[in-house]
Amino acid sequence: LYSGMALGIIQLILMLFLSSLILFNQNYDQSFLINKSSITRFPKNNLISVLFYLVVFYFFIPFLILIKGLSNFNAQLILSTGFLNSISNSMLISILSVLLAVFTSLSALFVYRSFLEKNSKLHKSIFISITILLFIPSLTLSSIIFYLNFNLNFIFSNFLIVSVINSFFITPIVFVFLSNKFIQNYLYESKQCLLLNISPFIRMVKIDMPKIKNELILIISAVFVLSLGDLTSVTIFNDSSFRTIPLFVSQLYNNYKYDDAFFILSIFIIFLFFIMYFPSRFLNRNA
């Protein structure tokens, strides 16, 4: 726990430091262009440039996993039952989690906009109730839902519980990302729908969905990747028969099979890259 907190703090500090360096370089370039007519020109600070590239290299380290993993290619591991079950579990969980998150987010956005159109202050409660999930630790939320299922004598399967937990994590991300575009011109649209007698369902299908189509494709691909990489909700079950890709890699590490773990990670990274690449490619083609 302390190691994880320390690593998170270090990464946060490095990200803030990197951002400050970028802003410093931009401001320096702008000031240099403004004062380029002056006779004396001061060179850039070499130390800042070195620190900048060191921080960039730090965040580039995960990509070295690709080189390490692909150099330990193992065809038998890819065709093994454990890996195939893990990838199928991960895909099914992510698909169901994304569907639940998108449905919940669109429903919440619909209610949120309805309160805005009625000039009701209840829209704030909708926004807070969704976004507060961002501030609840993943382990806490997973434990609460697991405990509820325990009191119900485990009537829900592990697959469904993990999917619901993941959907809680990604729902506020989808909600916040789509909210600005979804409520855009809501007063004008509301008046036109009243004049033309357009039902809320038709408005959602014919007006809202085309309006947020591009943003929806991007955020679905992003949260799908996030759901694939989640490990917290799976580990609380302590069930070796129910494995996802992150748990499969973790078990390889625990068994000191580091080469196999790096190889699976490299395959997983390439797979995630294509998941993010094809939606962006589709949007660029239709732009």
Where are the regions that the model predicts?
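Surface-exposed acidic loop/strand-edge motifs in secreted or periplasmic proteins
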Residues: 74-75
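Short cytosolic juxtamembrane segments of multi-pass membrane proteins
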Residues: 30-39, 117, 189, 240, ...
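Flexible interhelical linker loops that connect adjacent transmembrane helices
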Residues: 25-51
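Hydrophobic alpha-helical segments embedded in the membrane of multi-pass proteins
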Residues: 36, 122-125, 245
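Membrane-water interface segments at the C-terminal ends of transmembrane alpha-helices
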Residues: 6-23, 44-71, 81-183, 207-211, ...
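Short helix-to-coil transition segments within interhelical loops
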Residues: 115, 191-212, 254
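Glycine-rich helix-loop "coupling/hinge" segments at transmembrane-helix boundaries
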Residues: 1, 230-258
